């Protein structure tokens, strides 16, 4: 099912299946197993992701892929938003269908990035990078780090249906209502207009 409201250049995402998001797979990086003892091994993580995404789904990986031999095993249409560990973009372009080197604004309300973008109250920033469960950011950020989402990609379509953007609508309404009220107090004149 295609996602509604995406900018035209991203409208093909999820056309043939669901859209799923995860970050920080860190394939082949054994030190994470020490920090997160419940972390599945790399083959198991690939299996978990593939069971969700399937052959026809879209997988958005929000950086820090790790060993590309495991990334090659991932199914579906693969999109990478590069993370701080992702070096050598040419190799990624051979494996991923789309590669973005920095944050990507995919709609008027959704920003995808590896690291959380600070002061982004105008959008929902879906990111990864933050492994520590004790670190809380704010209601304008959603963390898809594999270690924070039980190593299972979120179903983006379902996430949207659950109303995760509803507070953005009220924030925008509050800003617009405030601007309208200030303009009314100026007698309908623009700022600086006499």
Where are the regions a protein language model picked out?
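N-terminal active-site segment of His-dependent metallophosphoesterases
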Residues: 1-70, 162, 173-177
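Intrinsically disordered, low-complexity, compositionally biased regions/tails
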Residues: 32, 106, 167, 182, ...
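A general structural motif
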Residues: 16, 56, 75-77, 121-122
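Active-site neighborhood of phospho(di)ester-bond hydrolases with catalytic His/Asp-centered motifs
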Residues: 21-23, 59-64, 79-84, 112-113, ...
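Conserved beta-sheet core of the metallophosphoesterase superfamily
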Residues: 90-177
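Active-site neighborhood of divalent metal-dependent phosphoester bond hydrolases
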Residues: 34-39, 48, 68-116, 120
């Amino acid at each position: 099912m295609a996602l509604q409201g995406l900018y035209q250049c991203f409208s093909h995402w999820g056309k043939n299946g669901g859209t799923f998001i995860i970050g920080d797979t860190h394939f082949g990086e054994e030190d994470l197993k020490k920090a997160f003892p419940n972390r599945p091994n790399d083959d198991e993580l690939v299996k978990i992701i593939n069971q969700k995404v399937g052959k026809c789904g879209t997988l958005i990986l929000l950086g820090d892929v790790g060993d590309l031999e495991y990334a090659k095993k991932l199914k579906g249409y693969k999109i990478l938003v590069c993370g701080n560990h992702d070096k050598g973009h040419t190799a990624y372009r051979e494996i991923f269908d789309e590669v973005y080197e920095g944050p990507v604004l995919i709609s008027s309300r959704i920003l995808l990035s590896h690291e959380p973008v600070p002061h982004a109250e105008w959008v929902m920033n879906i990111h990864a990078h933050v492994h520590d469960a004790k670190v809380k950011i704010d209601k304008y950020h959603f963390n898809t780090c594999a270690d924070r989402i039980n190593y299972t990609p979120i179903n983006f379509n379902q996430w949207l249906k659950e109303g995760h953007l509803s507070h953005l609508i009220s924030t925008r309404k509050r800003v617009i209502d405030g601007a309208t009220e200030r303009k009314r107090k100026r007698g309908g004149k623009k700022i600086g207009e006499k």
